[in-house]
Each structure stands twice: as structure tokens, then as C-alpha cells.
Regions:
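N-terminal beta1-alpha1 ligand-phosphate binding loop
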Residues: 1-32, 37-42
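Short, structured patches in soluble enzyme cores that scaffold and shape functional sites
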Residues: 8-10, 63, 130
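Flexible, gly/pro- and Lys/Arg-enriched active-site loops
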Residues: 31, 46-54, 65-152
Length: 152
């Protein structure tokens, strides 16, 4: 069984309800156990900044799914909650689920990059990761605490 970390974000609709709905759907997934959830944080948008503020969190999950299978489940949850991908990249969204880490695996495949390739640049993901596991190490990058310090 692997420990994976999934980021959750929303900036459209009832953001808190969107995150809670995503967590509820994840909890119903076979072979996925949500073992911890960070606090919810309001954050500024990244990339396309002229949009509403985000509500972000990270969930720690235990899973027997492969990284690809877990990603497919995350995308299915997004679709169930009305996520469409026809808008601008980094644009507003009802829900956004990203696979940040999958144990100590490093995966580079079409459509799947683990650890998330921009994780080390994203305070909105690093802070909740540090809340869940202060000693967590991002493969190929180093401790989450050091990555956060580099952003200061």
C-alpha cells in the first residue's frame, strides 16, 4: 500500500462544499483510504491572476492503486463535480485535484508526472503538505520544509 498526497482546490461556486464533495467521493473509492486532510486555506490564484481566490487543501491517502489508476480516479471525481477543461489553463474551476506525491515514486509518463512538476513552486500545496507531515521529503527536490523556506 502506498501513501499518496492529493491537492484539492476550487475557486468557483461554494468552494468549501466543492472540496468536501471531492473528499466524500474519494472516501467512497475502492482501494483509496483518505487518512488525513489538511486545513482549508484561502490562497491567491497562480498563473492567471484575474480570477477569484482559491480554497486549497491536501489529502493524504493510502492506496493499492497504481499512480496512473489513482490519477484516473481523481479525474473521474473532477468530472462528477462538473469540472470542464475547456477554459484557459490555470483558469477558474469548480474543483481541481492533482496527484502531488505517490510514496517515493518518480513517474514521468504522458499525462502523468509524479512528483507534481511544479510542486516545489506552490506554497498552496507545500504548506498543507507540511501540516500533514512536517518531515515529508519530495523525491528529487528535498524536504518540504526546505522547499517552503526557498519560497520566502
Amino acid at each position: 500500500m502506498a501513501r499518496a498526497y492529493v491537492s484539492l482546490g476550487a475557486n468557483l461556486g461554494r468552494r468549501d462544499a466543492n472540496l468536501e464533495s471531492a473528499l466524500a467521493l474519494l472516501r467512497r473509492e475502492a482501494l483509496v483510504e483518505v487518512v488525513a486532510v489538511s486545513s482549508f486555506r484561502e490562497t491567491e490564484p497562480v498563473g492567471l491572476v484575474d480570477q477569484p481566490r482559491f480554497l486549497n487543501a491536501v489529502a493524504a491517502v493510502e492506496t493499492d492503486l497504481s499512480p496512473r489508476e489513482l490519477l484516473e480516479r481523481l479525474l473521474a471525481v473532477e468530472r462528477t463535480l462538473g469540472r470542464t477543461r475547456d477554459g484557459p489553463r490555470f483558469g477558474p474551476r469548480t474543483i481541481d485535484l492533482d496527484l502531488l506525491l505517490y510514496g517515493d515514486a518518480v513517474v514521468r509518463e504522458p499525462g502523468l508526472d509524479v512528483p507534481h512538476p511544479r510542486l516545489h513552486e506552490r506554497r498552496f500545496a507545500l504548506e498543507p503538505l507540511a501540516e500533514l507531515d512536517p518531515g515529508l521529503v519530495v523525491p528529487g527536490r528535498g524536504p518540504v520544509s526546505a522547499l517552503l523556506a526557498e519560497l520566502d
